Amino acid sequence: MLMPKRVKYRKQQRGRMKGKATRGNFVAYGDFGIMALEPGWITSNQIEAARVAIARHIKRGGKVWIKIFPDKPVTRKPAETRMGSGKGSPEYWVAVVKPGRVMFEVGGVDKEVAKEALRLAIHKLPIKCKIVSRQDVEMGGEVNEGV
């Protein structure tokens, strides 16, 4: 499970997800990737489930890059606890994802295998995504044609 080794502050406010991704919005390492189409929080368990789905499908060929990291703690109070008496303790970690962000990349496998592996991974994620290739995405992050 992904999480930071140490953080300066244990608890964070929820924050807002405004606008599009300005960083990590193109396929940098592999040939194909998963691009987010809507904002959301991706938990470390969801990232791991998607990684396992990709790894199982591509078997020993190819390489997988995870381009997001869960660095935001989400707190939760115990069940049947009265309101008040402070903020709950950190329960799990999430990565904040904005539209246009490329979250996973796959390289070193043929087109059909890569697309099927990424399709399986998309089903593990809680937001709408699409499969993009290196040719589809310019350096600016704008998608020319849907794959």
UniProtKB/Swiss-Prot annotation:
GO terms for cellular component: cytosolic large ribosomal subunit. Transmembrane segments: none annotated. The keyword Ribosomal protein applies. It holds the Pfam family Ribosomal_L16. GO terms for biological process: translation. Binds 23S rRNA and is also seen to make contacts with the A and possibly P site tRNAs. NCBIfam families: rplP_bact. This is Large ribosomal subunit protein uL16. The gene is rplP.
